[in-house]
Regions:
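Bacterial Sec-dependent N-terminal signal peptides
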Residues: 1-35
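N-terminal phosphate-binding or glycine-rich loops at protein starts, especially the Walker A/P-loop
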Residues: 42-89
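Short internal beta-strands
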Residues: 90-98, 181
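Glycine-rich, charge-decorated loop segments at or immediately adjacent to ligand/cofactor-binding or catalytic sites
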Residues: 103-107, 179-201
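Glycine-rich oxoanion-binding loops at beta->alpha junctions
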Residues: 107, 111-143, 155
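Glycine/threonine-rich flexible loop motifs
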Residues: 152-164
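Conserved anion/nucleotide-ligand pocket segment
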Residues: 202-276
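Conserved functional hotspot residues or short segments at active or partner-binding sites
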Residues: 300-368
Length: 368
């Protein structure tokens, strides 16, 4: 009986994946019609599309914004900088994810009465990671809607998508509309890899029942959570997605003209992001995953390991798309680190992954 239930749930997930890819309509979520931009060669993200609409869905509304440093348009202008010059939109609260608004070294915010606020908008800054895993009631009771614009990593254990779903949970409790500005899956939308997490192992870093490399955009993942009943107590949010224009599922993130903005202090390139989908699994093991170096998720090692022996063994496997080299390194504490890396200040021996062809590289197979 349990096997049957699990099989049925898995079939529902597969069916929903196909419905997203083929753009079927949804019962509880809306994908907003957008202007036809097919004449233009560039990819337009949700923020770019909303700009083309002059932010009309937000006119004369008090808005809470969930965002970080990644919310930039095609010209590199940040969402909050664009909105501060818009007379018909009032940003009341800024919700920030893990690592903060503009990372932990953010100099933009000010302190007033012991609380953070953004001086450009006069808006409170509320962290929704750590002590508050979702927006507290006082922060949303006077809002008209919540706007979400954040670049995800395309990997299940990203906390950004977990926080997004917790925001949908709070919004459903308060009947508060949510608008999500869609952004690409950086690792292509046509590649899916890794197992679906078992429900008994779910956590904040494994919140959604999707593969490790899930192939969904952040908007698609929000629709999935809303339609599949993954919000607490099977509630549904009043969810609207402003989609992208001209994006294709076969695109890597660097295919667009948008500037690369690190989505995570340790993810500084699309190749690091790709490797994160495999080497991120090393967190919690007795291997350092490259944190504390300038090549996180591209090297792995430990003081007790022989990198030369391991590199020789792995090279014989002829793993596609990569070259494996022995390496020695010393992890150091960095300003952006929230905690010391494993084996900080110790000499580690291990391997380095040099990505030759990202289309052939299988991070999960390599890491496991």
């Amino acid at each position: 009986m349990n096997t049957s239930i699990k099989s049925t749930h898995f079939i529902k997930i597969l069916f929903f994946y196909s419905s997203i890819v083929f753009c079927q309509s949804f019962k509880h979520s809306v994908v907003m019609p957008v202007p036809d931009l097919s004449f233009h060669p560039s990819v337009f993200y949700g923020l770019d599309v909303l700009e083309q609409m002059d932010f009309k869905p937000m006119y004369d509304k008090s808005v809470g914004v969930f965002t970080n440093q990644t919310a930039v348009n095609r010209k590199g202008h940040h969402l909050l900088d664009i909105l501060k010059n818009h007379s018909k939109v009032k940003v009341e609260v800024i919700f920030t994810p893990q690592y903060g608004l503009f990372t932990q070294q953010d100099k933009r915010f000010k302190m007033k009465d012991g609380e953070k606020y953004d001086p450009d908008h006069g808006a409170r800054i509320v962290e929704v990671f750590g002590r508050n895993m979702k927006p507290p009631a006082w922060s949303i009771r006077d809002l008209d809607l919540i706007l979400i614009d954040i670049q995800d990593t395309g990997v299940r254990f990203s906390t950004y998508i977990s926080t997004m779903t917790k925001i949908l949970e709070v919004a459903s409790e308060w009947s508060l509309p949510v608008i999500i500005l869609d952004r690409p899956n950086p690792l292509r939308g046509d590649r899916v890899d890794g197992p679906i997490i078992r429900s008994k192992f779910q956590s904040f870093e494994g919140y959604h029942i999707v593969p490790i490399r899930h192939g969904l955009t952040i908007g698609e993942l929000a629709i999935m959570a809303n339609e599949m009943g993954w919000i607490k107590d099977l509630k549904r949010a009043n969810l609207t997605i402003i989609p992208m224009a001209n994006w294709k599922r076969s695109y890597w993130l660097d295919k667009s003209e948008h500037p690369w903005i690190n989505p995570h202090p340790s993810i500084k390139s699309i190749r690091t992001n790709l490797s994160f989908s495999g080497f991120g699994l090393l967190e919690g093991t007795n291997l350092n995953d490259g944190k504390g170096t300038d090549k996180p998720y591209l090297i792995a090692g430990a003081p007790w390991l022989s990198g030369y022996h391991l590199a020789d063994k792995l090279s014989k496997l002829k793993l596609p798309g990569i070259k494996i080299l022995p390496v020695e390194y010393i992890p150091r504490m960095k300003q952006t680190d929230q905690s010391p890396p494993l084996y900080v200040d110790e000499l580690c021996s291990g391997v380095e992954i040099q990505i030759i062809d990202p289309n052939l590289y299988d991070p999960l197979a390599t890491a496991t």
